[in-house]
Amino acid sequence: MKRASAGGSRLLAWVLWLQAWRVAAPCPGACVCYNEPKVTTSCPQQGLQAVPAGIPASSQRIFLHGNRISHVPAASFRACRNLTILWLHSNVLARIDAAAFAGLALLEQLDLSDNAQLRSVDPATFHGLGRLHTLHLDRCGLQELGPGLFRGLAALQYLYLQDNALQALPDDTFRDLGNLTHLFLHGNRISSVPERAFRGLHSLDRLLLHQNRVAHVHPHAFRDLGRLMTLYLFRNNLSALPAEALAPLRALQYLRLNDNPWVCDCRARPLWAWLQKFRGSSSEVPCSLPQRLAGRDLKRLAANDLQGCAVATGPCHPIWTGRATDEELLGLPKCCQPDAADKASVLEPGRPASAGNALKGRVPPGDSPPGNGSGPRHINDSPFGTLPGSAEPPLTAVRPEGSEPPGFPTSGPRRRPGCSRKNRTRSHCRLGQAGSGGGGTGDSEGSGALPSLACSLAPLGLALVLWTVLGPC
């Protein structure tokens, strides 16, 4: 029995040695190969300028990071059918052939980060990687995401695209990533979020878009993100954000909107209302404009603080100037002119909304309908209410022709002719101007001053006549 057990032990040792030899024997010279806990070929920071030849076909993990590799040729790892983890980060990769990862059907993690010279990736590069769940493409100098780049990556859960030079998010780029939970897009140059940018991301939990140049978010951009819990939009160029875009985010818990040039006028009211109902954790939303609200948190403002832009509750018509306005360049929605049937929705600052608070303003002579008896209207009835009451006579003194009620004379009080050098002195002209000026007097005051002025000038006129007839003494 002892002799049999001794023979079995030697056989087991021989088998283990053979397994170790099969892994270690073909190991490239600059690498270390081992099989516990997984069969691994490790060649980090060895100054390699190319993918080494002779990598064991049984390798499950290959570490080639921190070298000087600039090119990954097609079929570089085709023999490694069991490969699950491949690290190529921190090299000087400038080109990856489209079929570089062909045959790696079991690959789960691929790290290509910190290759600033890469700049672009062939759309077919990741085809066939059906089990890939983590993909690092951060700090690769990427300028665009080619169409179909992530096609077929149904198992992908983590996608790192931060700190690149991406300027746009093409439609349906992530459409096949139904299991993606983490998407990192911060530190790019993205200027807008279109409607279909995140279409298909039904499982997304975390979306990081901070430190970009986002100035506009489409109202339906987040439509498929019902499971999103974290949204970072800080340090962008957002001056407005449609509340409609946030409405689908029913699971949202963490929202960061700070460090944006928010414009806190009436266009911010929908966002303000949404923030009042939000029960998760959110950053401050400091206003940049108007100046009177600069630095104040939008969430802590009152509804009547958000003034300065005509907003209709019914249909509204955009103001079009024929060129891009400063507001459009900032990503602001255009102010709206109220529909003719809904002018009551234009509010004056400091006045509550009510059915009787109708749009009021200056009515030039001839524009009012005949017989308009709506009561006195003043210059401060304009939508902005910023002009002093003494700036012009009250509009009750301005009547369009033909609008006087029956029984009133249609001709106004007779006015004195203008000053003339032939029949008036300078003092006479000054007296005439004083009697007819005032800026804030009504018609009755002007007409009452004329007879008194005529009486005061009568002796002077008589003296002039006598001087003309009799001559100087």
UniProtKB/Swiss-Prot annotation:
InterPro entries: Cys-rich_flank_reg_C (IPR000483), Leu-rich_rpt (IPR001611), Leu-rich_rpt_typical-subtyp (IPR003591), LRR_dom_sf (IPR032675), LRR_TM_domain-containing (IPR050541). LRR repeats lie at residues 56-79, 81-103, 104-128, 129-152, 153-176, 178-200, 202-224, 225-248, 250-273. A lipid is attached at S447 (GPI-anchor amidated serine). PROSITE patterns: LRR. Residues 448-473 form a propeptide. Glycans are attached at N82. It is found in: Cell membrane; Membrane raft; Cell projection, Dendrite; Cell projection, Axon. Residues 346-447 are annotated as: Disordered. It holds the Pfam family LRR_8. Residues 413-429 have a biased composition (Basic residues). Disulfide bonds join C27-C33, C31-C43, C264-C287, C266-C335, C309-C336. Residues 27-55 form the LRRNT domain. Keywords: Cell membrane, Cell projection, Disulfide bond, Glycoprotein, GPI-anchor, Leucine-rich repeat, Lipoprotein, Membrane, Receptor, Repeat, Signal. It is a lipid-anchor; GPI-anchor. Receptor for RTN4, OMG and MAG. Functions as a receptor for the sialylated gangliosides GT1b and GM1. Besides, functions as a receptor for chondroitin sulfate proteoglycans. Can also bind heparin. Intracellular signaling cascades are triggered via the coreceptor NGFR. Signaling mediates activation of Rho and downstream reorganization of the actin cytoskeleton. Mediates axonal growth inhibition. May play a role in regulating axon regeneration and neuronal plasticity in the adult central nervous system. Plays a role in postnatal brain development. Belongs to the Nogo receptor family. PANTHER family: ANTIGEN BSP, PUTATIVE-RELATED, RETICULON-4 RECEPTOR. Homodimer. Interacts with MAG. Interacts with RTN4. Interacts with NGFR. Interacts with LINGO1. Interacts with KIAA0319L. Interacts with OLFM1; this inhibits interaction with LINGO1 and NGFR. This is Reticulon-4 receptor.
